[in-house]
Amino acid sequence: WILLLGLRHLRPTVFTAANSALDAGGVVGEHKFQALAPLQHNAPDLAAVCTRIAAGDGPLRHTAALRFAEVHGYPVVLKPDIGQRGRGVFIARNAAAVHDYLARFNGAVIAQQYIDGDEFGIFIARMPDQPQVQVLSIVHKTFPQVTGDGQRSLQQLILDDARARLIADTLFARWAEDLQRVPDSGESIALVEIGAHCRGSLFLDATARVTPALVATLTRLADAVPGYAFGRLDLRAPSIEHLQRGDGLRVLELNGVTAESAHIYHPGTPLLVGYAAMFRQWALAFRVGAARARDGAPVTGPVELLRRFVTDLARARQWF
């Protein structure tokens, strides 16, 4: 389908022009901080405060991360500046965890303020002549949790939970030191804290929750990042009601062209419905990219895209 669209538009990678705010349109290998920096400068009320810590293995990295945590408090989110699908994302709750993370990963890192609340992924698109963004998809990311009964261990609670046992190996590694602990009766334990489907989050379709107030806030957000016109915003809000009012939103990441309209992962969504959504998304990506290319946005060529994919495969070995 992508090849067909490329032939139709006579430029196979014109979709990369949809997001000049990100390297190669955010297809692969983009720097997350490239879009987060202008957002927190131009619309600080919509951003989770973050800073970029340069690659290396010297003590200055540790000092910078600890200083950030001292100012903004724990927990602090640490993640690769270049990364995808939640790989390498870690929530550090103390200085020892910060030191351990930086010792294991010496690439460029983003330290970000931890934002509590409900997490959402909102896919937006905008043609050059549109005054407001259009919302293609909203997904409500929920995190599996178990409740203790005073009898079963955490390991058994995980195995007895229909959702949690599907990712038991991941959860066992995450909770290795607590698996034999018996939670108190009524004690609730959030097993996952990172909003990535591959990390165990459950994605629920919330597209019907879109409101004019939300669209207005998302438009202001897009205006704060020049060149950002097509992609998924991962953000948190105090509640879904706050989201609908466009109130209290804090962006965690701005993803590019290859991000997915994640509502397709809603449990029970037919496969053909998911494919249809992705076909529509890619058709729109080409239209937005072509329109912005005509306005002068840069297009990344096929050879450069291939190089980026190869580099990304090698980079993935560093993540944990």
Report each predicted region and the residues it spans.
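A transmembrane-helix-recognition feature enriched in membrane-embedded lipid enzymes
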Residues: 1-20
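A short acidic, glycine-rich active-site loop
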Residues: 24-27
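Coil-to-beta-strand transition motifs
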Residues: 117-119, 128-134, 227-230, 244-249, ...
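A short glycine-rich, hydrophobically flanked beta-strand micro-motif that places a catalytic Asp/Glu
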Residues: 113, 121-123, 228-242
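ATP-dependent carboxylate/phosphate-activation module, predominantly the ATP-grasp catalytic core
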Residues: 125-225, 255-256, 260-285
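C-terminal active-site "lid" helix and adjoining low-complexity regulatory extension at the edge
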Residues: 238-320
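Short beta-turn/strand-loop junction motif enriched in small, turn-promoting residues
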Residues: 107, 127, 223, 238-242
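Active-site nucleotide/adenylate-binding loops and adjacent lid/helix of ATP-dependent enzymes
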Residues: 21, 31-173, 211-215
